[in-house]
């Protein structure tokens, strides 16, 4: 975290936002990260492109996705990215630890990641399926 003073145009200046699921330019995570950057935030963008590669829409270029987010950063804001598979119980705390190490802390967390494509109907979903998300 920085000591920069937020302005009405950039109310997230000096804040760090972690956004999970920033792996493709057509995704919600990308849109959220771009908007947070527009508002002055420094960002840790999490992605896991192997998941998208398994989907019918396919994977996007992670670097192109991150470059697109970088284009929204205001002067002084920074972007850090981490690839992590949240099926590994050690991954979520490691992502937060990296935000603290690289950006000084976490002011907001947007949990956008999800597992797609294997749920079936609502009547078939059980607790294990929900935990997988």
Model-derived features: where do they sit?
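The beta1-alpha1 cofactor-binding region of Rossmann-like NAD(H)/NADP(H)-dependent oxidoreductases
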Residues: 60, 82-95, 127
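Glycine-rich phosphate-binding loop signature in dinucleotide/nucleotide-binding domains
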Residues: 99-104
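A short helix-to-beta-strand connector/capping loop
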Residues: 67-80
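Conserved catalytic-site loops of classical short-chain dehydrogenases/reductases
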Residues: 16, 107-108, 131
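Substrate-binding pocket helix/loop in short-chain dehydrogenase/reductase
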Residues: 120-122, 126-133
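Canonical Rossmann dinucleotide-binding motif of NAD(H)/NADP(H)-dependent dehydrogenases/reductases
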Residues: 4-50
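Glycine-rich phosphate-binding loop and adjoining beta1-alpha1-beta2 segment
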Residues: 47-68
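Conserved NAD(P)H cofactor-binding loop of Rossmann-fold oxidoreductase domains
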Residues: 112-118
